[in-house]
Amino acid sequence: MDPKGQRVKLNDGHFIPVLGFGTFAPREVPKSEALEVTKFAIEAGFRHIDSAHLYQNEEQVGQAIRSKIADGTVKREDIFYTSKLWSTSLRPELVRPALEKSLNNLQLDYVDLYIIHFPVALKPGETLFPTDENGKPIFDSVDLCRTWEALEKCKDAGLTKSIGVSNFNHKQLEKILNKPGLKYKPVCNQVECHPYFNQSKLLDFCKSHDIVLVAYGALGSQRLKEWVNPNLPFLLEDPVLSAIAKKHRQTPALVALRYQIQRGVVVLAKSYNKKRIKENIQVFDFELTPEDMKAIDGLNSNMRYNELLLGVGHPEYPFVEEY
């Protein structure tokens, strides 16, 4: 942690802000909103912005970042921007063109972090979710170690400062860590993580290898029908979280975010609501007690909101492992 406790050091020497702004929004949300809310998030104090080629909003998010640099709110080096390599570009020869496409959409010279979004390779092409005539995903077969080597080259070329992964299980991480001739370790593994699914085993594994765990879905997910089982309970209505929030005069969302930061997890707060964006930055204004942390640990039931079922049946589908 740096003095203000708001950034952690990655294993390659760069620093990542512990609180990030997630820019993903459902399809029906107009893309122009990504521009507005990202500008607002930067004004509110967010310095870590998380997006991806899959979100189809990098043009707007890049525009927001550039406008806040142009008006003097921030310098480029104040912003930590993450993009992600989508599953249709996991073949090694497609990695750099995919990153260059993101940079072109963003109109930025580099990203701070480039990560493999999901270890399941899909058929290359413009279609994000290629399917056959029966609506089944069309998989591709790619050695993730070769994909990783292509990411290492992107780092060497200065297109990204750091490289990492997302939605990997510990065996997939091990495969990269044990790869002969490994040049750079993944700096992070971005996974679903919240009090109902606290990823304690994966977190311990990552910490033991100096890999930062980044939490998405930290507030329990946006519950999009195509991704999330609608019968699952709402995290933010949990009585234990509510009681702890009341005690600290905070919201359950802030308690859920604070919980991650105190465990050494980098946490993404995803909201397109300006009041809540402003509220989420207040996560640094209070501290949970060891008793609070223990009570929240007790909520874990290994309940995954985002099963990413499109990858089921692929040999690299990550969620068949316990962690």
From Swiss-Prot:
Could you cite one Gene Ontology molecular function of this protein? aldose reductase (NADPH) activity
Gene Ontology process terms (BP): daunorubicin metabolic process; doxorubicin metabolic process; progesterone metabolic process; prostaglandin metabolic process
Could you tell me which InterPro entries the record lists for this protein?
AKR (IPR020471), AKR1C (IPR044482), Aldo/ket_reductase_CS (IPR018170), NADP_OxRdtase_dom (IPR023210), NADP_OxRdtase_dom_sf (IPR036812)
Q: What is its EC number?
A: 1.-.-.-
Which positions are annotated as binding NADP(+)?
Answer: 20-24, 50, 166-167, 190, 216-221, 270-280
Site-annotated residues for Lowers pKa of active site Tyr: K84
Its name, as the record gives it, is Dihydrodiol dehydrogenase 3
What is the source species? Answer: Bos taurus
